[in-house]
Amino acid sequence: MDYSTATTTAGNGYSSPRDSSFPSSFTKFNSALTAGLLNPMSPPPPPAMHDKTRSSPTLFEMMASEADTIGKVPVQIHNGVLPSPSSSSSSSSAAATAARTTNVNHLVISAQDKQALAMQRISDLLVIRSPGNQFNDPNSSDVKLTLSSKDGISITMCVHRQILVAHSRFFAMKLSDRWSKQQLPPSSSPYIVEISDCDDVEVYIETLMLMYCRDLRKKMMRHDVSRVLGILKVSAAIGFDAGVLSCLEYLEAAPWSEDEEYRIASLLSELHLENVGATEVLRRVSVEASNGNNGSNGGSNDEVLLNLLHIVLEGKDEKARRDMKTLVSKMLRENSSGNDLRKESLYLACDGCLHKLKRQFLQAAESDLENVDQIARQADNLHWILDILIDRQIAEDFIVMWASLSELSEVHSKVPVVHRFEISRVTARIFVGIGKGQILTPKEVRCLLLRNWLTPFYDDFGWMRRASKGLDRYLIEDGLSNTILTLPLAWQQEFFLAWFDRFLNSNEDCPNIQRGFEVWWRRAFWRRKEQSQEPARLRVTASATENS
């Protein structure tokens, strides 16, 4: 290449004259940098030794010259044969550059390199065919079909009018007798058909090859889901019904990834293939498709999820129960609509757990410790259901129900702490929910909750803190402080003074709500002082007005 007089404008906006004042290696490096083939942060190669001849060009020179040799014209394949080496040097060079830039410099493959690789795959696809297959056979074909894409790829292949017409409604119309008579080719000349703006020429060719295949199912098994989706789109576009059915049969039986699942549902919805088997495919991911229009098959989402809740609540293996609770909570949390599980169903499950808890707790209070482990189990179940209710913003009725359980709070001290402390974890979760504004209830309900359950909560706090793994003490203390601070000031005083006395006598076994106490103190005494001074200021203002 001649670098003697050209002026190149680099990507940064500066132009670099290429004259004799610059070493040839620098100008070639600058040309490669301008073409986007090198990392701009890489240092330039050292100046060339003019007195030393090289037998072969350097890597920098090859990459620099490549930018000018890659042509802009579309690459064409005729009958599965790539252009001659002299005319295809730029394409093969681009493929080599792709390998070098990917493996050596870790750069993104350019559009020209991708085109060259695609052309090579298409060439291999057209050349290789099973014995007896007449696809792309120039000796027996009567149609020259040219496919061209938007990115400049153009392929001409030899196909058979009889096969295309028999399998495709598009080609049946395109190659109809009326159209054939208008063409009137000589007996030795094939018909010429051109299809432009193909999305993917390679997929289009594979779809045409299926028309020549006797066992489409076996042929389809060689492809992955992504390629089958491409074939399905082309088959639907050209009216290749056998190809559409084969693709749908494959998709119905093959496993999908989550990304493929979205693409499949989107494409089937776009193509409207319900009458030819798409519904069978969608039944894997759509309840409506599985149930049909009448919805008679299978249960509703609410029934299924309620059944799952009961299975988890009554499971025998504790480790498996914990794992499944986490899983079910995650799935319910991901469904933001909340229409899958009715409020009544959740509270029905809650009532069942609460009934068992009350029965076992009252028995334990009378020194009947048979099945006493059910107290902790049912309290844990209620804690889990409460989390779900809070996530769905429907926990207000639970707070009313829990605050009214005076029959349990009154006998709380009669049950050994090792069996009862899980109940206080439910109370703690309520404090956190109210303190964060996740649960909004009337002040009378909040006050009743504290009157019935605050003392039992204090009694269990030390044991709960030591026995419960992962317990966030500071989160609970902050929630309790905020819960008390939501009450009228006179009620706040009652609860904070009771805490103050208890904290001084059992420091470690009592939650530290000093922050809330300080807020109440400022509210109570500072404002009283301000209010006592306010009438005097008003009187002074009034007298000053009269004197004026």
UniProtKB/Swiss-Prot annotation:
What are the UniProt keywords, alphabetically? Phosphoprotein, Ubl conjugation pathway
Q: Which InterPro entries match?
A: BTB/POZ_dom (IPR000210), BTB/POZ_dom_prot (IPR038920), SKP1/BTB/POZ_sf (IPR011333)
Q: Which residues cross the membrane?
A: none
Compositional bias per record (Polar residues), positions renumbered to this chain:
1-14
Q: Where is the composition biased (Low complexity)?
A: 15-25, 83-97
Q: Which Gene3D superfamilies match?
A: Potassium Channel Kv1.1, Chain A
Coiled-coil region: none
In Gene Ontology terms, what is a biological process of this protein? protein ubiquitination
Residues with the modification Phosphoserine, per the entry, are 130
Renumbered residue ranges of the record's region Disordered:
1-25, 77-97
Which pathway does this polypeptide act in? Protein modification; protein ubiquitination
Q: Does the keyword Phosphoprotein apply?
A: yes
The reply on keyword Phosphoprotein is yes
Domain BTB residues, every copy:
141-220
According to its UniProt entry, the function of this protein is described as: May act as a substrate-specific adapter of an E3 ubiquitin-protein ligase complex (CUL3-RBX1-BTB) which mediates the ubiquitination and subsequent proteasomal degradation of target proteins.
Q: What is known of its domains?
A: The BTB/POZ domain mediates the interaction with some component of ubiquitin ligase complexes.
Q: What is the protein's name according to its record?
A: BTB/POZ domain-containing protein At1g63850
Q: What is the lineage of its organism?
A: Eukaryota, Viridiplantae, Streptophyta, Embryophyta, Tracheophyta
